[in-house]
């Protein structure tokens, strides 16, 4: 439970900070002006997200930006949007690589089991890597208000107009929760889990 809380809070914070860093690079200093370039996860999550986190153990964050300040009018929003999932992917690779090295340096852990404290370390790293792979995939879904919708809108004015509809965000969230409750996302989770295991094993084999 504590590991889950740690990884959720860290992943959300770094995800949102990545959006902020990209926005600043694009010429928008709103993240600094609003005090959101902070390592405090409470700054990014907000009240409703915290309530949902307390109830079901999942949450989300927000980084305020002003797209009209971006240097690249068409691609700026896509650049800022892709920065968040890219951060999740980076966390996943760093964590899974660390897990592979951890296991590879002590091959007896794979053959004869692990002492309790070593198993805790392995589980901790495994959770962080897998969770961030899932967050990467979820955020790339082309469903507003997820990052994937903003990335895709850069390639199509028609999609951009639809995504900017006042009800698009609500419709997108309903569709997103339907995907989760109907297990339509399960095959993606299975694919990511398989990748995580094989990647970790490949790293471990080097050592």
Report residues per predicted region:
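Hydrophobic transmembrane alpha-helices and their immediate loop junctions
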Residues: 1-207
